[in-house]
Amino acid sequence: MGSLLSGSFTVFLPGYGIIFPKATVPDAIADVVAGNADFAVIPQENTLGGAVTNYVDALIAEENVFVVGEVILPISQTLMGVQGASIEDIRVICSHAQGLAQSSEWRKEHLPDADTQEMASTAAAANYVAESGDRTIAAIAAPGAAELYGLSILAENVQITDANKTRFYILSATPPEEGSQTHMVLVASCEASRIDDIIVEIHNAGLELVTIHDRPEGSRLGAYHYIVEVENGNGITDKQIEIIKAIPEVRVLGCFKTMEKQR
């Protein structure tokens, strides 16, 4: 878990237990399924980069975890290198695809000739730079990663805009407790011609559409997994959950409240 992910979890459950990193999102989810961890945190969507599709795919593939919370964090991206490095030294910049996308304008202006290297996460990029000891390689990651991996901050706020935010899902092997949950996330696995009808059924149940993303279903052309998030500001009711679960192509991934940390 990188510094952004750990930050999102402390908003969800401040002071809870021990937070430890995993190399990949599937690894983190597997630990939850195996009972080795109570929760996992995965980024779901970014203001600039859109849906974090490879992480969403990992969530869809596992039927034994539930979304029990959502946290929205303001994102500040930082360029960091080994101790003693300077911006003039940098020839390669590594980060997650989202980190590279979010810093594209800054990189074009300040390091236009630097190559980029995509990593599994921004935290993995920071760790890679630290282990390399190479002054010519830098990472783009959250500011806390510099302290975590003993790196030097070379430039701050390299993201395109201060409006940059990321939504994180909190996952658990235990379904969320019943109560005043305001949001629901579901996956509809169907042909493209069917999704409009499903959206109508969701609307008729009294739920408002928040986001929808599609991913290829993988077995035939024209079939997709649609990840749909809906809300009811007054609280999602048991009846609404029953209606959604009765739609043949739909699997409910979880009901939850959403929390947002201000910059």
Language-model regions, residue ranges each:
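Domain-level signature for soluble enzymes in the chorismate/prephenate branch of the shikimate pathway
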Residues: 1-263
